[in-house]
C-alpha cells in the first residue's frame, strides 16, 4: 500500500469538502437573516437562538473530538454516515412559520423553540462530520509535504461556500418576486432554495471518504483526560487562545447579508447578487492565494509569523472601510466609493482566507508535535479546536449583533415596517429614519473585525520560526 493518497482520493475529498461547505455556507450566510427579517422573530430572540446554540456547540466540540479520537471507528465511518442527515436538518432549519403579533402566544413560542431546536441539532450533527473532514488529510498520508498540499487545497471548499453565500439569497428573492413578494412568499422561496442547495451539498459531501484508505492510524488514548492537551500542547494552546481572542472576526459573516440587503440592494435580487459578489470576491481571491501561495510562504517565513502578519495587516482595511462610510454615509454605491470598497474588501477577504488556511496548518503541526511528546495522535480532538473557534466566534458575534439591533430599537415590528417601506419603493440608506441602522451595520461589519484581528495575532506576535 502506498504511503500517500491517490489522485482519485484527493479529488473525492475535495468534492466532499465542497459539498460540506455548500451546506455550511447556506446556513451561515442566510439563517440569521431568515429568522429575523423573513419570518420576523425579534432580534433579541434571534441573537439568543444563534449565540446559545453556537456557544453550546463550540463548548461540546472538544468532547466530540475526544470521543472520535478515543472511539473504535475510523474517520471515514463518520464521513459516510453524516452527509444525508446533515442535508435533511439543513432543510428543517428553514421550515418555521412566521412570527407575528396576530399569532397566539403559544404559536409564537413554538416558532422560536423550533428554530432553536432544529438549529442546535443541525450544529451537533454537522460537527460530527466537520471534525473528521477537517482532520482527514492527516490520516490519508504520512508524508508531511503531501499533507500540507492537501490542507492548502481546503480553500476549494471555501470557494463552494462562497458560491452558496453569493447565490442563496438572490435566488430566494427572485423566487419570492415571482410568487408575489409577500412575507409568506419570501419564506417559501427560501425553503425551496435551501432545499435545492441541501440536496446538492449533501450529495457531494457523500463522496468524501468513499473508496479512501486511512494510511495513518490514529494512536488512540483510552484515558478520559485528553482535554489536557489544550493546556499541555503549546501549539494547540496558542492557536486556541488566538481563536478565542479573535472571536468577533466572525461578525463579517453575521452582518454581510443584512448589510447588502438593506443598505446596498434594498432587497433587489440582481443588486443583492452584485454587491454580495463585490464583498465576496475578496474571499475567493484569498482562497486562490491560499491554495497557491501558503505552502511556499509558510515554508519561507514559518506558519506562526505568517499567521501573525496577515492578522495585523487585516486591521487597516477594516478601519479604512468604516472611515469611508463615515465620510459618505448615503453614497457608498457611487462609483469611486464602490471601487475603494472593492479594493478594501479584496484585502480583507484575502487576509481572512490566508489566516484560516494557516490556522489549519498550525493545528496539523500541533498533532505532529503531540505524537512526538506523548506518542498519541488525537487528530479529531485537535481539529475540533478549529470548529470550536469558528462556532464560538459566530455565537458571540450573533449575540453582539442582537445587542446592537436592540440598542437602535430595531425589533420585529420595525423590521416589518422596513420591509413594507422597501416594497413601496423606499431606499433605506437615503432615509434619515434608518441612518442609525445603516451606521450600526457598517460599524459591526468592520470595527469588531479590526479589533479581533489585533487580538488574535497577540499569541504569535513574537513570530518564532517553526
PLM regions and their residue ranges:
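Membrane-embedded alpha-helical bundles of multi-pass transporters/translocases
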Residues: 2-466
Amino acid at each position: 500500500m502506498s504511503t500517500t493518497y491517490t489522485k482519485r482520493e484527493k479529488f473525492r475529498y475535495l468534492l466532499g469538502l465542497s459539498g460540506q461547505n455548500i451546506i455550511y455556507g447556506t446556513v451561515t450566510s442566510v439563517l440569521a437573516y431568515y429568522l429575523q427579517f423573513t419570518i420576523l422573530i425579534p432580534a433579541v430572540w434571534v441573537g439568543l437562538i444563534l449565540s446559545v446554540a453556537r456557544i453550546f456547540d463550540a463548548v461540546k466540540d472538544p468532547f466530540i473530538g475526544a470521543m472520535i479520537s478515543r472511539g473504535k471507528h475510523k474517520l471515514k465511518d463518520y464521513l459516510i454516515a453524516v452527509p444525508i442527515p446533515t442535508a435533511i436538518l439543513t432543510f428543517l432549519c428553514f421550515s418555521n412559520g412566521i412570527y407575528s403579533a396576530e399569532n397566539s402566544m403559544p404559536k409564537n413560542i413554538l416558532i422560536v423553540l423550533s428554530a432553536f431546536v432544529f438549529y442546535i441539532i443541525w450544529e451537533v450533527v454537522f460537527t460530527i462530520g466537520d471534525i473528521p473532514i477537517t482532520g482527514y488529510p492527516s490520516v490519508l498520508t504520512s508524508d508531511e509535504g503531501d499533507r500540507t498540499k492537501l490542507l492548502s487545497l481546503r480553500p476549494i471548499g471555501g470557494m463552494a461556500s462562497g458560491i452558496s453565500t453569493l447565490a442563496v439569497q438572490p435566488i430566494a428573492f427572485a423566487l419570492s418576486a415571482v410568487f408575489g413578494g409577500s412575507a409568506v412568499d419570501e419564506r417559501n422561496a427560501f425553503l425551496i432554495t435551501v432545499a435545492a442547495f441541501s440536496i446538492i451539498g449533501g450529495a457531494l459531501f457523500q463522496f468524501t471518504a468513499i473508496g479512501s484508505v486511512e494510511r495513518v492510524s490514529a494512536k488512540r488514548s483510552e484515558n478520559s483526560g485528553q482535554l489536557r492537551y489544550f493546556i499541555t500542547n503549546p501549539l494547540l494552546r496558542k492557536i486556541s487562545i488566538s481563536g478565542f481572542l479573535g472571536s468577533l472576526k466572525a461578525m463579517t459573516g453575521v452582518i454581510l447579508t443584512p448589510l447588502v440587503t438593506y443598505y446596498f440592494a434594498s432587497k433587489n435580487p440582481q443588486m443583492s447578487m452584485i454587491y454580495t459578489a463585490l464583498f465576496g470576491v475578496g474571499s475567493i481571491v484569498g482562497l486562490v492565494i491560499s491554495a497557491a501561495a501558503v505552502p511556499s510562504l509558510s515554508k519561507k517565513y514559518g506558519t506562526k509569523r505568517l499567521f501573525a502578519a496577515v492578522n495585523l495587516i487585516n486591521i487597516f482595511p477594516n478601519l479604512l472601510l468604516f472611515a469611508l462610510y463615515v465620510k459618505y454615509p448615503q453614497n457608498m454605491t457611487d462609483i469611486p466609493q464602490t471601487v475603494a470598497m472593492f479594493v478594501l474588501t479584496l484585502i480583507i477577504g484575502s487576509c481572512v482566507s490566508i489566516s484560516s488556511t494557516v490556522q489549519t496548518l498550525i493545528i496539523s503541526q500541533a498533532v505532529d508535535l503531540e505524537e512526538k511528546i506523548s506518542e498519541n495522535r488525537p487528530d479529531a480532538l485537535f481539529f475540533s479546536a478549529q470548529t470550536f473557534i469558528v462556532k464560538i466566534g459566530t455565537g458571540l458575534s450573533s449575540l453582539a449583533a442582537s445587542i446592537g439591533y436592540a440598542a437602535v430599537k430595531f425589533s420585529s415590528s420595525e423590521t416589518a415596517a422596513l420591509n413594507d417601506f422597501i416594497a413601496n419603493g423606499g431606499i433605506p440608506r437615503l432615509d434619515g429614519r434608518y441612518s442609525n441602522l445603516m451606521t450600526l451595520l457598517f460599524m459591526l461589519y468592520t470595527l469588531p473585525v479590526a479589533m479581533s484581528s489585533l487580538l488574535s495575532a497577540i499569541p504569535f506576535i513574537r513570530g518564532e520560526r517553526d
